[in-house]
């Protein structure tokens, strides 16, 4: 597990946390134009962010998987799920979170993906967001940011780049990096 902390923000990344699985009773998804890629491996990660704002501490946990594929399309899916009585689970950072992605936060996750999905810059393959955790102070803005950062982490893992600079940048400055990790592009 990788953890970065400052006074106002914290981030933690781990390979997986099945206790935050989303069963997918509802889901959104689609196909996006993508760049063909030459090589890459399946990458799975879970990211938790904390951000202090005044007396509030906003939290977001998202996780998923990216698998590079052939062609010029990226199939993406966000599983949405909330139990009637979720059991709190220990997050990656201090404190418990409720597994699930309730209404409102689900839109934030999709929003966090849309800019990159619409750019045509993502590599071809399959992307699924299927892990999430929240609490009463979870923020849609932080969930969108967490989703953007998770995409950086998944692509870095799939193509052998470092995800750490993107995470450190967010913790230090509160902003996601503008450029996605470099991926091997297929020659035509």
PLM features per residue range, with description:
Residues 1-188:
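Accessory interaction regions appended to the cores of large information-processing enzymes
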């Amino acid at each position: 597990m990788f953890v970065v902390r400052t006074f106002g923000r914290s981030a933690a990344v781990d390979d997986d946390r099945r206790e935050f699985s989303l069963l997918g009773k509802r889901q959104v998804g689609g196909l996006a134009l993508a760049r063909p890629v030459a090589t890459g491996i399946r990458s799975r990660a879970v990211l938790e962010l904390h951000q202090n704002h005044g007396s509030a501490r906003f939290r977001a946990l998202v996780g998923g998987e990216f698998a590079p594929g052939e062609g010029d399309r990226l199939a993406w899916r966000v599983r949405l799920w909330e139990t009637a009585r979720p059991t709190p689970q220990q997050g990656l950072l201090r404190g418990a979170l409720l597994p699930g992605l309730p209404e409102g936060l689900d839109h934030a996750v999709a929003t966090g993906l849309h800019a990159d999905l619409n750019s045509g810059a993502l590599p071809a393959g399959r992307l699924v967001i299927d892990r999430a955790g929240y609490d009463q102070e979870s923020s849609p803005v932080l969930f969108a940011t967490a989703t953007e950062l998770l995409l950086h982490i998944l692509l870095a893992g799939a193509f052998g780049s470092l995800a750490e600079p993107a995470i450190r940048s967010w913790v230090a400055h509160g902003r996601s990096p503008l450029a996605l990790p470099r991926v091997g592009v297929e020659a035509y």
